[in-house]
Regions:
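Secondary-structure-rich domain cores
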Residues: 146-148
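Terminal regions of secretory-pathway proteins
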Residues: 1-133, 150-541, 545-550
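Alpha-helical bundle segments that constitute or directly flank the non-heme di-iron/ferroxidase center
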Residues: 132-144
Length: 550
């Protein structure tokens, strides 16, 4: 895998600024002597996630507010509210707003934490587009992809209505994003058994009515606060610019948290090229120093007892305790795996860990039942064909299965209740020709006569068999978009730009912020293997930063 795959998913932990509400503080105590933080620094700042009322306002466990839509629906591109979407749009030709270098628009609120930068920070559908340079790249990629498709639709149809062009381009982009996610990203992450067990890959051709209206597709706590944070172990200490002709310049990742300067003056193109070819960090229990000790390091001294930087691993474990998720062993059983009764790696113990990883867990926890999900899952030995151990594979496959089978607007649906809302067979053929390498090739500018080349399977290294570098002209096959816009344009003209539901009412969006303030997934989980088993909440009170890496 490459850094492109490591950054396809976004960071899910964000830094809390200067605290305004002490009742929400859940600081992490630092024992001294600490191998990194200087004497006198006794706590690491941590703010709890905002609580939300239980379903129907009944009494129950504390739940957390999720302000994002619970589907692969491009909310990081378009936002999760109408107000944010309006700010992100250009109001001409169905396009999204860009800055003068075809990058993300300026964030009028400035940079997070009051950071002073040479260039302005960015605004996107997600609040973290400037968090790291490698996270900014996919934001810019899909912004440009939307505008490219909107322009192509305008030329092919002659339609000038901004709303029609925007919604149609958005519809195509979301379908392509879903296709790339389930047919390139997840196969690079999970083994064949997990992909097949949860029916994650799309059909090679045609429609697929996988929608199940009895499923609750919202994000389970274990996925958001532990399993999907597995990408943090793939982060490297450096980011880079590949300027072509063997000219590569590298930078410390810790120097560019929420600093967008590397994206300007063709920096996006240089960074995208570097990400496609550089190796990622190994998927294991270790985090690099740039995010374990120097995350969001500040040159400004905070309170006397507070650290000037953060430890992402510690924050992830504390976030799991903030949400009150059960321990590692509970999720082993949830996934049909055997619980660990002792720390040895023999049957009955930590059978999916190396002796070194098991010993590190034993030094940190008193009993296997005390192991936090993030620590236990991240330290598992990857299974063959995957970069993850069985527990995180199970949870990620389970959640993405819910996202797919619980999505009424999944791109492969036939929509028997309203066929106008579905893609035609001809349109699906074009969507299923989408690859991430085509998306990337379509949006990059050629700089100084240097033409881009990428491997066809962009999320995998070019050194693997049948994945050697190819020119973008060959990848796109002479079509700037990488697919034929004609079927979409022809149908849009036939519908006269109107895509209405059967009763003349537009289909609603997937649930947005207003809905999610009232509804949230439960914190008890039903096993996909044993539907009758239920695992309740288990809470912890505090967290001591481990002296050793686990």
């Amino acid at each position: 895998m490459t850094p492109v795959s490591a950054k396809f998913s976004t960071y899910l932990t964000h830094h809390g600024q200067k605290r305004k509400y002490p009742q929400f503080c859940f600081n992490i105590r630092i024992d001294q002597p600490d191998p990194f933080f200087q004497p006198g620094k006794t706590c690491m700042h941590f703010v709890r996630h905002l609580g939300a009322p239980p379903l129907r306002c009944e009494s129950g466990v504390r739940e957390q507010l999720n302000e994002r839509t619970a589907f692969v629906d491009g909310s990081m591109i378009y936002g999760s509210t109408f107000d944010l979407e309006k700010k992100l749009r250009d109001s001409f030709g169905g396009r999204l707003a860009e800055n003068y270098e075809n990058l993300l628009p300026c964030n009028e609120k400035g940079c997070p934490r009051g950071i002073i930068t040479k260039y302005h920070c960015f605004m996107a559908g997600d609040h973290r587009p400037s968090e790291t340079p490698t996270l900014t790249v996919p934001h810019i990629t899909w912004l440009r992809r939307h505008n490219l498709i909107a322009d192509a639709l305008r030329r092919a149809t002659g339609i000038r209505n901004d709303e029609i062009l925007f919604q149609e381009a958005r519809r195509i982009v979301i379908a392509q994003l879903q296709h790339v996610t389930y047919n390139e990203f997840l196969p690079a992450l999970l083994d064949d058994f997990t992909m097949n067990y949860f029916n994650l890959q799309s059909r090679s051709s045609g429609h697929s009515d996988v929608y199940n209206d009895r499923l609750d597709p919202r994000t389970i706590n274990a996925f958001g606060v532990a399993a999907y944070r597995m990408g943090h172990s793939l982060v490297r200490n450096i980011v880079g610019h590949d300027r072509g002709f063997g000219k590569i310049q590298v930078f410390n990742v810790s120097d560019f948290f929420e600093v967008p300067d590397l994206m300007f003056k063709n920096g996006y193109e240089f960074m995208a090229r570097w990400m496609s070819r550089a190796p990622k960090s190994r998927s294991d229990r270790f985090l690099v120093n740039g995010i374990r000790n120097e995350l969001f390091k500040s040159p400004i001294e905070g309170e006397d007892s507070e650290t000037m930087s953060l430890d992402l691993g510690a924050l992830n474990i504390q976030r799991g305790r903030d949400h009150g998720i059960p321990p590692y062993n509970a999720y082993r059983e949830f996934c049909g795996l055997r619980r660990a009764r002792f720390f040895a790696t023999v049957p009955g113990g930590l059978v999916d860990h190396t002796p070194q990883a098991a010993a590190a867990l034993q030094r940190t926890y008193r009993h296997p039942d005390d192991i936090d999900l993030y620590a236990g899952g991240l330290s598992e030995t990857p299974r063959k064909g995957s970069i993850l151990g069985p527990t995180f594979q199970c949870l990620i496959g389970y959640q993405f299965g819910l996202y797919k089978h619980g999505d009424r607007f999944w791109y492969e649906r036939t929509f028997p209740e309203n066929a106008v809302a579905a893609f035609t067979q001809e349109e699906l053929v074009q969507i299923k020709r989408t690859t991430y390498s085509k998306v990337m090739c379509s949006v990059l500018k050629n700089i100084g006569g240097h033409f881009h080349s990428f491997q066809p399977r962009l999320l995998l290294r070019p050194e693997i068999e049948r994945n050697q570098l190819q020119s973008c002209n060959r990848i796109l096959r002479g079509n700037r978009l990488g697919f034929d816009i004609t079927p979409f344009a022809r149908r849009l003209l036939r519908l006269r730009g109107r895509r209405r539901a059967a009763l003349g009412v537009s289909f609603p969006r997937n649930p947005g912020t207003r809905f999610l303030r009232l509804v949230k997934p439960r914190s008890v989980f039903y096993s996909p293997i044993n539907p009758g088993r239920v695992f309740p909440i288990r809470r912890r009170i505090s967290f001591h930063r481990p002296k050793r890496t686990i």
